[in-house]
Curated annotation (Swiss-Prot):
Record-stated family: Belongs to the CFAP97 family.
Protein name in UniProt: Uncharacterized protein CFAP97D2
A Pfam family reported for this protein in Swiss-Prot or TrEMBL: Hmw_CFAP97
Amino acid sequence: MHGAPRLTFPCASEYLWHAREKAYQDHRRKVQSAQPLVDTRAPLTFRHLHLKLKRLKLEEERLSVIERDNRLLLEKVASVMRTRGQTDSKNNSKHRRK
């Protein structure tokens, strides 16, 4: 027990002292075995609030556009590789000065 030191018989009679001591011991036992009353768990989460369907749909559309652009670029690169990338870089016309 902690607190101030207790006198042997602070009451007028020994019977009252035992009754108060028993009540105090019962109180200490209840305090020791007390369970917390505050709920410290995380609040309930709802999946439909965390799963952003609109965001997933927009992401899927964005990825499909990227895939389509990549496929078109790949076709262009393959076409250049097949035709050996021949371009008309020779210019036979004369430059005119103004």
